[in-house]
Regions:
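Hydrophobic, membrane-inserted alpha-helices
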Residues: 47-51, 89-97, 112-118, 176-177, ...
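C-terminal ends of transmembrane helices
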Residues: 18-27, 68-73, 114-128
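Re-entrant/interfacial helical elements at transmembrane boundaries that shape
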Residues: 63-73, 112-116, 189-199
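Helix-loop-helix hairpins and the membrane-proximal interhelical loops
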Residues: 1-44, 134-179, 197-201
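Short juxtamembrane and helix-loop transition motifs at transmembrane-helix boundaries
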Residues: 43-47, 64-76, 91-101, 168-175, ...
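Membrane-embedded alpha-helical segments of transport systems
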Residues: 55-64, 77, 83-99, 104-109, ...
Length: 211
């Protein structure tokens, strides 16, 4: 039961950190982000590139998709441009997963300290936006570390080991991935949980790929 509470707490920190960082980035960019997107999506390749970069920035392919739909409805973008950006958004999500896989959680407290310091001492809105970015990044990786620590006891559970062995079935792994992402409404959050399990050797590489 303790590991479940730890997982929930870590996931909560991860989601909050991701949201805080995304909000800070959007505030820092302001309307410039929308103008840049509109200007750079004149061809499919640039659309894919923009979709990838924007998703990496705001940490949410769903938010990128919603933004694109809004642009299309407003007549600022055609369907041809939208398809390229949405395709790029899915690529951006995988890059986010690669960032999460890097073992930089030990630097999370430093990022949190710097973020809080900037937020408290900063007078300008732009400085506070930068503070939210740094603080959000720190909280995000702190949440990742918390999930990994919470999952460590599961590695000694025979029942859980047998359950994970079944995930070598590609269709079952795919189903688990779909259900997790649907519930969490964030593929990055789903990846974070899976990577936390993998960091404790609770889930093998084959199962991780399927999910």
């Amino acid at each position: 039961m303790d590991y479940l509470l730890g997982l929930m707490g870590g996931l909560g920190l991860f989601l909050y950190g991701m949201s805080l960082m995304g909000d800070g980035l959007q505030k820092a960019a302001g309307n410039k982000l929308k103008n840049i997107i509109g200007a750079l999506t004149k061809n499919t390749f640039m659309g894919i590139l923009v979709g990838t970069v924007v998703t990496m920035i705001i940490q949410s392919s769903s938010a990128t998709t919603v933004m694109v739909v809004g642009f299309v409805n407003a007549g600022l973008m055609n369907l041809y441009q939208a398809v390229g950006i949405i395709f790029g958004a899915n690529i951006g999500t995988t890059i986010t997963g690669q960032m999460l896989a890097l073992n930089i959680s030990r630097y999370a407290p430093i990022a949190i300290f710097i973020g809080v310091l900037l937020f408290m001492l900063g007078k300008k809105k732009r400085i506070k936006s930068y503070a939210e970015i740094v603080l959000g990044l720190g909280i995000l990786f702190f949440g990742m570390a918390a999930m990994g620590d919470a999952m460590r006891p599961l590695g000694e559970s025979a029942v859980y080991a047998n359950l994970m062995a079944k995930l070598t079935n590609p269709w079952l792994g795919l189903l688990v991935g779909i259900v997790m992402t649907t519930i969490l409404q964030s593929s990055s959050a789903a990846q974070a949980i899976i990577l936390a399990l993998a960091s404790q050797n609770i889930i093998n590489m084959l199962s991780l790929i399927h999910i």
